[in-house]
């Protein structure tokens, strides 16, 4: 308890010290011409229209004209971040400060369910915490990035922590073809008979690579992903899906079996405790390139950019998720590919009986040079006001709420100006995204510098590696806990109070006719 109080006090003190103020000189005149006053007024108007609502509440014993203190406690909108570094930062002080963000800055968290590291061996998922998942292990670990479960904490303690903090929980992902991060190597290595592997090689001259079992689980052959994809691409040119399936039927049967089993096991353990799922991640390219833009083709296997996948794997993923998850859990289709065929895929899945509740969109600004270009007014179209509007107008055609599920905005460098550039880009983009009618949540990706995946920028966090807040943290906190939180005084009339505020839970406080303070919790919806 004492440590928690220290962490809370530390964050509060930091926030008090550095109230965010925009330094417009960090950006060029060209940038501010793009994000001009008219643009900002339009964003403000849309936020007022789409993110706020009117509330009218009856108050027992309130005198006419009495002042009612109106204070928002929680948001209905989801402001999230992944929590992949839970307990892994190397010092208790850093871990405590990291944990304190969930339930204060973030009311939602994305929890890692990546198959490869969640189930490094068949029938042995890493749900429960073991010693290797504890802070003691990570605090004494000299090279954390070399550990196979870096950024992949055991699920049970993370779920318990988030529920205790009152956070919404989002699971990511159930189905994904990615051969470096998701597909367990043991499905091919252990459940495809050698006779089938030889038959495929004899027919095509292509040897599908296996994992190097001399290396530790999770570390072994990270480059295998590229080799795996390249080998299957050669096979695709020679054989149809039906011909491939005839050569490796046991593998395809095993993949289908273990994929359904995975979703069933996760649903049985976490279905009632997780609010939403990225059921299928990044499958739009396959839908367009290999499926002829048909959600259901009936083929036994699926040629995929990720290597061979089960036939109709996106459709099956949603069918299994609907079967094993409660109806209260949202089922999301998530992708970085915002081509028109992405929202077409969502509609096609629905037309074939799948429940798709939310569409997820990613936006990663990984290159520090791009942040410099944006500051100069030369940035990519999709991060300009008109580009943001066009992108989400298109995605809104799916007719679903939108979860901006993975956001990266890197600083160009760690100078004060570089940090301010990151903060201003983030602030303007968040405001524009928050103003989109169908947006229901925004999830920042890497909270801490130098804690991302290989290839991701080391300075894209809101905090430094030793958990010192960056300018972008103050800018985000200023939006979520300042500009976008309603705190006002309203006058009672006729035993009621009315006001307009951001959707969420409120505490209403007033004095009755005897001068006694009264409170009521109310929700603006």
Name each model-derived stretch.
Residues 80, 275-282, 308, 313-343, ...:
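Aromatic-lined carbohydrate-recognition surfaces of secreted/lumenal glycan-active proteins
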Residues 91-105, 498-507:
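Short Pro-Gly-centered beta-turn/loop motif in secreted/extracellular proteins
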Residues 332-362, 421, 452:
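Substrate-binding cleft/loops of secretory-pathway carbohydrate-active enzymes
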Residues 24-26, 31-33, 188-223, 227, ...:
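Aromatic-rich peripheral "rim/lid" segments of glycoside hydrolase catalytic domains that contact
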Residues 19-88, 108, 121, 127-128, ...:
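Beta-strand-rich domain onsets/edges
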Residues 68, 89-95, 183, 288-292, ...:
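Distinct, well-ordered alpha-helical segments
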Residues 102-106, 111-241, 246, 258, ...:
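Aromatic-lined substrate-binding rim segments of carbohydrate-active enzymes
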Residues 57, 109, 162, 266, ...:
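Conserved, mostly hydrophobic/aromatic
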